[in-house]
Structure formats: C-alpha cells, structure tokens
C-alpha cells in the first residue's frame, strides 16, 4: 500500500458547520475503510492548513477517489501528496541516475 498525506483547508461551509467536524471525520474514516483505504492519522492543525490526514491506499486512483469524494461534500479543500518512508526513498534514490 502507498502512503499519502492530505492537507485540509476548511471552506466557508465547513467553518459554518465546524461543530460537526468530528462527526464528519468519523464518517470519512468509515467510508475510507469501506473503500479499502487505511486512515493512519487524522489531525486538526494550527497554521497554514486546518488539518492533515495520513493514509494508505492501494494506488493513486484509490487515493484520488477518496479525496475527491471528501472535497465534493463542500466542507474542505484538499491537497494530496504521495509520501515515501526512508526505505522507499532510499530505493528511489538508488535507481536515479548519477550525474
């Protein structure tokens, strides 16, 4: 499974219904599980973004489908990145051409 990091920003709608955010997060986790996606961590944050989700999915299509569904509800905007652990990154670097 591949690891992904999604940054979350509340929309105006999401802010107007901020008290429902924990309930929406629980529903999101349940939907992700049904889709075969494992939510590793979910955080609300201070700073440039309002939250972050770390999850594992079988491929980019599954990850994209999950975050598109989340964004389509209108409460958040998302930015998703593929994340690599130290072992994965070492393998990538070992295969890159040296200049």
Locate predicted features.
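A compositional/biophysical signature of low hydrophobicity enriched in polar/charged and small residues
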Residues: 1-99
């Amino acid at each position: 499974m591949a690891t992904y990091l999604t940054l979350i920003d509340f929309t105006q709608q999401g802010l107007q219904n901020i008290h429902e955010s924990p309930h929406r997060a629980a529903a999101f986790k349940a939907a992700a599980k049904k889709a075969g996606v494992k939510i590793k961590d979910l955080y609300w944050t201070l700073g440039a973004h309002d939250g972050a989700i770390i999850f594992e999915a079988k491929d980019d299509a599954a990850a994209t489908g999950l975050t598109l569904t989340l964004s389509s509800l209108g409460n958040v905007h998302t930015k998703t990145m593929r994340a690599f652990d130290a072992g994965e990154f070492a393998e990538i670097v070992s295969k890159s051409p040296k200049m």
